[in-house]
Structure formats: structure tokens, C-alpha cells
Amino acid sequence: PFYLDIGFSKEQIANIAAAFGLAMTLGGAALGGFMVARFGIAPILILTAFMAPATNLVFAWLAYIGPEPQGLVLAIIADNITGGLAISVFIAYLSSPSNTAYTATQYALFSSLMTLPGQFAAGFTGLLATQLGWIGFFCVTALTGLPAIILAFALLKLAHPDHVARPGID
């Protein structure tokens, strides 16, 4: 409802999302794989921890400027590149401590756990958006990314994914 509420037509949304959505997600995933291979998991995990809330600020900006097609293109590109990048880095991170004998099981468990907070919060987002308006909503959701940033830094101190022995490999 966000895009429609700020004045985009269904046709505009479909055309722009179709033109940029999947390609940017795949591009983000490929970029994430390249960056993890080049720089390691840790710095890219930190980068994506910052990028995800920043993407929400792009949506706040889009709500502010209104139905500008270039704004929608930028928001979709930013969101999908960030999503693709983040999921590829998160998969690399989840795979890093896994015992190779149980990688599929551990990945299934961890990736399912990853979706729980979002599923829980989804029930409240409509109410929050109604109460705060779209700009306030996206600013608040950007702030909810701060714990992830703090956790990413704490994770690096406790168990740096690029330096931890992998059971079954090391």
C-alpha cells in the first residue's frame, strides 16, 4: 500500500519493479559473493548492517518527495541491491561456523530463525505506519536497525567469522 498511498499507479509500480527488481537483487547477491570472497565476511556483514536501515531512509525520502518515478527507481534499486547483498553475506556467515556434516540442517534452522523477528513485527507495521505516517514509519524502522549494527560489531569481537575454526574442515 505504500507506493499506492504516496501516489504511484499500479502500472508504474509494476513497470519499475519488473525492470529493476529481480536484476538488482541478483546483482546484489553476486556483488555480495564477490565482496565476501575479496574482503571476507566480517567487513561486508558490517556494511550490510548499515545498508539495511539506510534503505529504509530512502523510502522515507520517497514518501517525502511523492510519486516521482526516478525516486521509485532509486528506492527499488537500493532496496533490492541491499537485500541481495545482505542475504548472500548472511548465508556466508551462517555457513561459516557450520559443521560440514550438518550444513544443510544448520542453514535451514538458522535461516528460519532469521525470519522470525520480521514475521512477528509484520503484524504491527500497519498500525505503526497509520500512527506515524510513512516518513515517520520508515525513520523508526531505520532506527530498529541499530541493534543489528551493534550486534554485528559485538559478533566480530566474540567470534570473528573470518577467523573461527570450522568444525569438520579445520
Locate predicted features.
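Multi-pass alpha-helical transporter architecture, strongest
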Residues: 142-170
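Transmembrane alpha-helical cores of Major Facilitator Superfamily
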Residues: 18-23, 50, 77, 108-116, ...
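A late C-terminal transmembrane helix in Major Facilitator Superfamily
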Residues: 97, 101-130
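Short amphipathic helix-loop junctions that connect adjacent transmembrane helices
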Residues: 1-17
